[in-house]
From Swiss-Prot:
It catalyses: Hydrolysis of Ala-|-Gly bond in repressor LexA. Belongs to the peptidase S24 family. It comes from Ralstonia nicotianae (strain ATCC BAA-1114 / GMI1000) (Ralstonia solanacearum). The gene is lexA. Homodimer. It comes from the Bacteria. Its EC number is 3.4.21.88. This is LexA repressor. The record marks A99, G100 as: Cleavage. SUPFAM superfamilies: LexA/Signal peptidase, Winged helix' DNA-binding domain. InterPro entries: LexA, LexA-like, LexA/Signal_pep-like_sf, LexA_DNA-bd_dom, LexA_repressor, Peptidase_S24_LexA, Peptidase_S24_S26A/B/C, WH-like_DNA-bd_sf. One of its GO terms (biological process) is negative regulation of DNA-templated transcription. Residues 28-48 bind DNA.
Length: 216
């Protein structure tokens, strides 16, 4: 790894720890709050310095668009597939999901991937191919593979995979009583409001990490 200043190392460690704990990097605002910076712009300057030293990659326009890079240029948390040295856990990749059938039904499985389970904040049960850019600012882009742990409940603020009627969506979860709000991480998308007494809603799982396939 390149030689980092004390502050740069602290920020790098925070990014690493946040990904390990939540599966996703912190925002600039969260970094600024952690270190007492006056604004997210100060955090941005440190992130750019880390990017120039080659230890992280930044995705323009995404508040959580930060990727750690390991020595040799590989990213340990959002990485290219396949990686022959990391074949320890086999996960099904879920493609399109038919209405009314379980998300892990055989007809939904496009293929199997073998990955290193240590790359995720919790052990995932399946991968879901992301479609669209509604979670862009969380660093989740169209075509990414979201690692998902099956769960029937979620804490507020978690990124979840949910089924609403015939659709499966990835959003940030917020619940108050019998009302659920599914919030995009992109200002171009409005929140989805769910009435649990009226709407057909099912939580399929929690996001625990992300894989970005290599460009063809």
């Amino acid at each position: 790894m390149a030689t980092l200043t004390t502050r740069q190392q602290q920020i790098y460690d925070l990014i690493h720890q946040t990904i390990q704990r939540t599966g996703f990097p912190p925002t600039r605002a969260e970094i600024a709050a952690e270190f007492g910076f006056s604004s997210p712009n100060a955090a941005e300057e440190h992130l750019r310095a880390l990017a120039r030293k080659g230890v992280i990659e930044l995705t323009p326009g995404a508040s959580r668009g930060i990727r750690l890079r390991a020595e040799g240029g590989a990213s340990p948390h959002q990485f290219s597939l396949p990686s022959m040295g990391l074949m320890q856990l086999t996960l099904p990749l879920v493609g399109r999901v038919a209405a009314g059938s379980p998300i892990l039904a055989a007809e939904h499985i496009d293929r199997q991937y073998q990955v290193d389970p240590s790359l995720f904040s919790s052990r995932p049960d399946f991968l879901l191919k992301v479609r669209g850019m509604s979670m862009r600012d969380a660093g989740i882009l169209d075509g990414d593979l979201l690692a998902v742990q099956r769960a029937a409940e979620a804490a507020n603020g978690k990124i979840v995979v949910a089924r609403l009627g015939d659709d499966v969506t990835v959003k940030r979860f917020q619940r108050k009583g019998r009302q659920v709000e599914l919030i995009a991480e992109n200002p171009d998308f409005e929140p989805i409001h769910v009435d649990l007494d009226r709407d057909e809603f099912q939580l399929e799982g929690l996001a625990v990490g992300l894989i970005r396939p290599a460009a063809p």
